């Protein structure tokens, strides 16, 4: 199957049919905490190894002493105008949660909301085909799904995966002294906002798209390194938000080398033009109290919501060389962006 975008009529731009875009649609961490607070008695299952206590990327259920099942779902509104590309990005983003736990996907089902009276069904078909393309690249079937008539376009997947329990990685199990690595550059929110504001130059139109369509398959191999102590993906809460989850879960402080954080090409140029998504401000409002004092420039980068972002890896010093060799072999530039240490201040992240 070709992954060439479908040609849309000039009058139809998917991003104009949604109030948010990609993982920037996420409900803020502060509001989400209110939603998830339950008055019901706690029901426990000893076989549920990972639930929502640590805001991890997926749930993990123990089948036996060796194998676990991973379950996750993710969906959002259009982040690009092309329907095929939108579907491909949304599916890639959902599948990557499986890799972020150290597992491999085995099947997916689609979630589709579509404004039937506003947009032709043929465009929805292209969205679903984009999802199929991502599933094919991950080696799995799009096995079914569910659709509703909705006021705005929505697409995503519920994905099932499997994992050898010895390889299971979580976001709250980092250790003091771990080094931090990021497998994709930051800046997707900035570039996609530039597109929505009609400031994105044609020659830059594929920078964010290519990053968002890259599956995090490397996660399943990273997880086999015993010295990798924690793993998560960087999505809607931005690098700072997902790093905070890692730090708070392990009671550690991150010493973040801000100047080492990799950025997508042209991200700084569009940031200078004021291309800051609303999700950036919501993110900072939600967790800024746990960060050091930041300039507006630093906020715009560290809190930039990523869609189908990369993996954040916490690796021991002893296993760092093994991780670097693996990243190099898979054409991922290994850049250490910081380390994890014993807390010395109220902030969970400090810049160095």
From Swiss-Prot:
One of its GO terms (cellular component) is cytoplasm. Signal peptide: none annotated. The record marks 26 as: Important for catalytic activity. It catalyses: hydrogenselenide + ATP + H2O = selenophosphate + AMP + phosphate + 2 H(+). Its cofactor is Mg(2+). Binds 1 Mg(2+) ion per monomer. Mg(2+) binds at residues 57, 97, 233. InterPro entries: PurM-like_C_dom, PurM-like_C_sf, PurM-like_N, PurM-like_N_sf, SelD_I, SPS/SelD. Gene3D superfamilies: PurM-like C-terminal domain, PurM-like, N-terminal domain. Its EC number is 2.7.9.3. The active site is at residue 23. Keywords: ATP-binding, Kinase, Magnesium, Metal-binding, Nucleotide-binding, Selenium, Transferase. GO terms for molecular function: ATP binding; magnesium ion binding; selenide, water dikinase activity. CDD domains: SelD. GO terms for biological process: selenocysteine biosynthetic process. ATP binds at residues 26, 54-56, 74, 97, 145-147. It comes from the Bacteria. It is an enzyme of class 2 (transferase). Coiled coil: none annotated. Synthesizes selenophosphate from selenide and ATP. Belongs to the selenophosphate synthase 1 family. Class I subfamily. Homodimer. This is Selenide, water dikinase. It comes from Shewanella sp. (strain W3-18-1). The gene is selD.
């Amino acid at each position: 199957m070709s992954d060439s975008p479908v040609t849309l009529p000039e009058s139809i731009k998917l991003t104009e049919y949604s109030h948010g875009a990609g993982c920037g649609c996420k409900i803020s961490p502060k509001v989400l905490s209110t939603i998830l607070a339950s008055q019901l008695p706690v029901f426990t299952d000893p076989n549920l190894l990972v639930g929502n206590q640590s805001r991890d990327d997926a749930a993990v259920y123990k089948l036996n002493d060796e194998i676990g099942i991973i379950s996750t779902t993710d969906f959002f509104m259009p982040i690009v105008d092309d329907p095929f590309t939108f579907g491909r990005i949304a599916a890639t983003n959902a599948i990557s949660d499986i890799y972020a736990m150290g597992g491999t996907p085995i099947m997916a089902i689609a979630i589709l909301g579509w404004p039937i009276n506003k947009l032709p069904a043929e465009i929805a078909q292209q969205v679903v085909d984009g999802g199929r393309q991502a599933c094919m690249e991950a080696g799995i079937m799009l096995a079914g799904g569910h659709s509703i008539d909705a006021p705005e376009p929505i697409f995503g997947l519920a994905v099932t995966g499997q994992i050898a329990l010895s390889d299971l990685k979580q976001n709250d199990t980092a250790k003091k002294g771990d080094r931090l690595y990021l497998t994709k550059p930051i800046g997707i929110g900035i570039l996609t906002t530039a597109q929505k504001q009609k400031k994105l130059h044609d020659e830059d139109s594929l920078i964010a798209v290519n990053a968002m369509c890259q599956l995090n398959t490397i996660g399943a191999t990273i997880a086999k390194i015993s010295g990798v102590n924690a793993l998560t993906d960087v999505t809607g809460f931005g690098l700072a938000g997902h790093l905070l989850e890692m730090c708070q879960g392990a009671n550690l402080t991150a010493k973040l080398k801000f100047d080492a954080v990799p950025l997508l090409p042209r991200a700084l140029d569009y940031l200078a033009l004021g291309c800051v998504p609303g999700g950036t401000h919501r993110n900072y409002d939600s967790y800024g109290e746990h960060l050091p004092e930041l300039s507006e420039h630093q906020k715009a980068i560290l809190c930039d919501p990523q869609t189908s972002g990369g993996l954040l890896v916490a690796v021991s010093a002893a296993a760092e060389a093994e991780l670097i060799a693996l990243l190099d072999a898979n054409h991922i530039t290994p850049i250490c962006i910081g380390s994890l240490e014993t807390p010395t201040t109220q902030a969970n992240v400090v810049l160095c």
